[in-house]
């Protein structure tokens, strides 16, 4: 997974891993691509997706807003990342991927609703809505 604060966060880092996979002929190793983590480093996610087509198998989806206090995670359809456009771009380059949701809602009484809304949003975007 491309994780902030590690040596794997930029497109170049991910491509190095991809080239390593190629050099070693590793058939069952793929990249777990976290869109939000990448977006924080480089907002033009759509430009890296075609380059990593061969290596990504798993897409991790979460969204956030940013202000003077830092990053605050929100439901998928309410944040800074335009998942509808990004998922459309993903569909242009991939046939078979696994998508997952990550929800950081801290208030227990809101968590189920945030997960439900995020799931419905992701499902809509995946299915062309």
Language-model features: locations:
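Histidine-acidic metal/acid-base catalytic patches
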Residues: 8-33, 39-129
């Amino acid at each position: 997974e491309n994780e902030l604060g590690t040596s794997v966060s930029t497109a170049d880092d991910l491509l190095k891993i991809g080239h390593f996979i190629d050099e070693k002929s590793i058939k069952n190793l793929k990249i777990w691509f976290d869109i939000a983590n990448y977006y924080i480093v480089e907002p033009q996610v759509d430009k890296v997706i075609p380059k990593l087509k061969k290596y990504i198998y798993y897409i991790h989806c979460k969204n956030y807003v940013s202000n003077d206090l830092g990053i605050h995670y929100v439901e998928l359809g309410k944040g800074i990342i335009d998942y509808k456009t990004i998922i459309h771009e993903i569909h242009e380059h991939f046939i078979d991927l696994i998508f997952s949701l990550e929800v950081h809602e801290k208030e227990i009484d809101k968590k189920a609703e945030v997960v439900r809304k995020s799931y419905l949003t992701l499902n809509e975007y995946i299915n062309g809505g």
